Structure formats: structure tokens, C-alpha cells
Amino acid sequence: LPRALKSRATVNQLLEGKLQRDNKDEVIAACDLQNILDRDVHNLSGGELQRFAIAMSCVQKANMYMFDEPSSYLDVKQRLNAARTIRTLLDTDSYVIAVEHDLSVLDYLSDFICCLYGVPSVYGVVTMPSPVRAGIKIFLDGYIPAENMRCRQESISFKIADTGEELELERSS
């Protein structure tokens, strides 16, 4: 992001320059930018840059907003705040498209999910939109019921254990 900027500027200057909505203070608070408003964008960490990039999108008016992994470099609290802030962009005249691999953020952020699968540099397929829970199930199962097609050989599953010892015993057996 800093390389895309032609000149050096502070977080606040850049937000002011793109301000098209009456939500700057709310976005600054939600993205936790209060302490970095006077800092040069070239001096921000990865997480600070991510929060700044989200804020820059959120202060602008658009018919469609696109976010590529908005939760990258953010801690859990920041991820939920980012998702909450992004959801405020939705109205009858605007849409949000997000690519996200964190299923909890995806669950919170989305109304519908499309899964993408294929072979790099060969082909790619996008599923029809599914409700959130069904879309996450398609992703985890690797099976698309509407197309009667498997997009991955193995399902992804999670094991729940009361203690770490149970997991250690299972791994060693």
C-alpha cells in the first residue's frame, strides 16, 4: 500500500482526502486508528496498514466494495470490528464482496457465500451463492450438493477436546 502512494502523507490526511461519507469518526474508532492518525502511512505495521486500508474504503461512497482477506494481520477483536465496520457499508444501493479464509469472520460478515475451486492456471469454478451456514458446510465438506460434485477429496473437520492431553494421546497413537 505505501508503494502505491505517490507522496508521503499521514493517515488522517489520506482519510480526509477520500472522505465521501459522514462516518469518519465512527470508522476511525472501529478500526482503532486514533493513535496513528498523525503517522506517515509508510511507517505503519502490517496490522495498522490493514486497518487503514479498510478505513479508506469505508469512508468512500461506492456501489460495490471489494475486500481481499480483510482480517489478515488483525487480532480477533480487530477482525470482528473490521467485519462489523464493513457490514455498515451495506444498503439497498451497495454491495460488498469479500474474499476471506477465516470462517468465523466469514460467518459474521456474510449473507451469502460462493466457494471457488479449481486448478491454478488451468480452470476455476465459482459455486452459486448459498446461505452462510450452507456455504461454510460446502467448503468444509468439499462437496457441492446442487451440482452433485466433489471439489476436494477430503472433508475438513475439527476435533474438540477437553484438554490438550487428549490431543497428544491421539497424535502419538
Regions found by a protein language model. Give the residues of each.
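ABC ATPase nucleotide-binding domain signature region
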Residues: L1-Q20, L49-F52, H101-I136
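ABC ATPase nucleotide-binding domains
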Residues: V126-S173
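Conserved catalytic loops of ABC-family nucleotide-binding domains
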Residues: T85-A98
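Walker B catalytic motif
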Residues: F67-P70, K77
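Hydrophobic anchor residue at the start of the ABC signature
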Residues: I54, A82
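ABC-family P-loop ATPase nucleotide-binding domains
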Residues: L1-G46
